């Protein structure tokens, strides 16, 4: 099948992001692709042209482009109407990661059909059920249904005395309620009108007395099939439960090798690979999504069990900048874009 113009457009939120994002993908660009970066406001629908930034003869150049054959969406929380219009212009399933802001409740519902053993108890927030879950688990995380990077997350912990401690980002409490009645009377004012979920708190493994996560980056490659690109861990700042506030990022293998003998570390890694790929298969079953990549954040329980904490539809690529030999992180989306050009 012909590749037509073989062009790929990377959609970003604003003009200031164009050069930074494009530079990352040009370094590992697949052959025979013309790559440019554009924003929603740079589309001229009447003339069917796009103003985009590209690299030409060693220079950064802004120019006019026809609609590309494939669009890679790196614009978070994209307007659905924009995606629908782009799909009508370039063809069905030629824009990938068009939905990249996931509903945590919807993801939980989808994954729980097949992966319930790896999911903490999760439900839409309401005051009455929150108290029941607190009595059962003693530790809850309240999360915005559409949140990211730990923003808006509230940790709720019930003490043996009956006190309820409320904290954000760090374990130290910001607010202390004397009992469940005080909690129920006040928690909605803390959360506001944003829809929240509540998630069971898991007693998780630490390294150097710090929380860490394991992020599996799952990407499609030149054959359109899923694979796990790497596992990277963020080690949270001292006293923080939010790994988006981290002091160090490294390959997860390094941490697991410190905590466990090789056979246990390898068993944990195999489990994470298997669960991540199963998650990808489940996401592909939903016709509303067309993903070329996403990440799965895991927590490791004290009993060595792996728990899915959340899925991210716009993986943070700067996380990999200090990690050696990670150019494949940027290469894979271009390989998948080339696959879409020919299929």
Where are these regions (language model features)?
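Conserved N-proximal alpha/beta basic substrate-recognition cap immediately N-terminal to
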Residues: 15-129
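Residue-level signal for well-ordered, solvent-exposed loop/turn and beta-edge residues enriched
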Residues: 59, 224-225, 305
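Short, solvent-exposed loop/turn elements at beta->coil junctions and helix N-caps
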Residues: 127-128, 201-205, 295-297
């Amino acid at each position: 099948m012909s590749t037509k113009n073989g062009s790929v457009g990377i959609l970003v939120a604003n003009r200031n992001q164009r050069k930074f994002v494009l530079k990352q993908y040009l370094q590992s660009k697949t052959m025979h692709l013309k790559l440019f970066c554009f924003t929603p406001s740079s589309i001229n629908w009447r003339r069917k042209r796009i103003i985009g930034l590209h690299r030409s003869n060693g220079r950064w150049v802004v120019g006019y482009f026809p609609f590309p054959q494939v669009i890679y969406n790196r614009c978070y929380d994209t307007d659905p109407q924009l995606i629908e219009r782009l799909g009508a212009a370039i063809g069905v399933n030629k824009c990938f990661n068009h939905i990249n802001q996931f509903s945590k409740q919807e993801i939980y519902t989808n994954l729980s059909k097949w992966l319930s053993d790896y999911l903490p108890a999760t439900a839409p927030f309401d005051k009455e059920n929150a108290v029941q879950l607190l009595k059962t688990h003693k530790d809850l995380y309240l999360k915005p249904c559409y949140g990211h990077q730990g923003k808006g997350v509230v940790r709720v912990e019930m003490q043996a005395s009956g006190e309820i401690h409320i904290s954000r980002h760090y374990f130290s409490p910001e607010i202390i309620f004397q009992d469940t009645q005080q909690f129920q009377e006040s928690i909605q004012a803390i959360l506001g009108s944003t829809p929240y979920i509540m998630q069971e708190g898991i007693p998780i493994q630490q390294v150097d007395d710090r929380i860490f996560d394991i992020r599996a980056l799952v990407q499609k490659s030149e054959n359109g099939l899923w694979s796990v690109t790497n596992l990277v861990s963020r080690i949270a700042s001292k006293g923080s439960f939010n790994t988006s506030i981290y002091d160090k990022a490294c390959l997860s293998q390094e941490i697991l090798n410190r905590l466990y003998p090789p056979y246990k570390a390898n068993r944990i890694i195999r489990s994470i690979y298997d669960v991540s790929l199963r998650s990808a298969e489940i996401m592909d079953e939903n016709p509303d999504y067309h993903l070329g990549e996403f990440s799965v954040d895991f927590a490791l329980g004290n009993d060595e069990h792996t728990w899915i904490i959340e899925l991210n539809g716009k993986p943070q690529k700067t996380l990999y900048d200090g990690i050696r030999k990670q150019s494949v992180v940027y290469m894979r989306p271009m390989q998948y874009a080339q696959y879409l050009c020919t299929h």
